[in-house]
Every structure is written in C-alpha cells, then in structure tokens.
UniProtKB/Swiss-Prot annotation:
Record lineage: Bacteria, Pseudomonadati, Pseudomonadota, Alphaproteobacteria, Rhodobacterales
UniProt keyword Magnesium present: no
Function text: One of the proteins required for the normal export of preproteins out of the cell cytoplasm. It is a molecular chaperone that binds to a subset of precursor proteins, maintaining them in a translocation-competent state. It also specifically binds to its receptor SecA.
Keywords: Chaperone, Cytoplasm, Protein transport, Translocation, Transport
Protein name: Protein-export protein SecB
GO biological process: protein folding; protein tetramerization; protein transport
Amino acid sequence: MAENGAAEGTAQQPQVQMNILGQFIRDLSFENVMAQKGVGGEVQPDVNVQVALDAKKRSTENQYEVITKLNIESKNKAGGEVLFVLELEYVGIFNIAGVPEDQLHPFLLIECPRMLFPFLRRIVSDISRDGGFPPLNLDNIDFVAIYRNELARRQAEAPAEVTN
C-alpha cells in the first residue's frame, strides 16, 4: 500500500523542464595591457576572477534571461603590473517549466549559469590565447556559494536600509 502512495505522490509533482533556447555574448572586452606598455620578460600571472549573476523574466511565458558577468584581471605577481583585463557578459535564454515559484530564483541563478559555464570557459580560454597569453582555463565556479553570499549580503544590507 505504501508503494502505491509513493508512486501517486511522485506522479503529482510537476516535471521540471529546462531548455536553452539561445546563448550569446552580449558584451566582450579584452585589453592586453602588457603589450600596450611594452612590458616584456618573464612574468608570473596572478589572476583574479569576479563573477556576477542576474536573471529576468522575458515577455514570453516561461522564458527567462540569465546573465553571467565575468571580470578577469591578470597581474604580474612580482611587480603588480596589470597584464590583461577581460570582461565578458554572457547571456542564456531559457524556457523553464515545472519549477515551484519559491525555488525559481535559486534555480535561475545556480542551475542556469552552471549549464552555460562550459561555454564561458571556452570563450575565456580562446580570448586569452588569441590575446597573446597562454589559454586561461577557469576553475569550476561554485554558483551555490555565489548565490548564498549574495543572499547574505542583501540580508546584511536590509536592516541598514530600514533604519535609515
């Protein structure tokens, strides 16, 4: 009897569906500072990667736009000179159905960027290589940690806004 109840409960839950309808580079900038300044010789890069995420509903039902912004700065460890700066804004258009409303926000800012990440990694690798540097292969990004940090930051700011 319990097996039937479990099967019925599973059948009632909506099936989550996610399709990537499109993905594209919205904005891309690469600046080879090292070449512009004529810096040469042996360098040891120190790479700093900053990630920002955003999502918004589109006018079509169940469609969302998810934006991943990367700001990457590579500096020489020895002198601190900037070697290159790469800024990338990458967008995915998703059709999402069956996700409960209270879980949609984390789904958009965790699962969708996770699906786009291999493409971002490839673009960063190609651009850094084509810019005259060894290919920069990004480590995996923990989108769950980024989401939690952003929630904590917003909660910390909320009491400050109420008292002002």
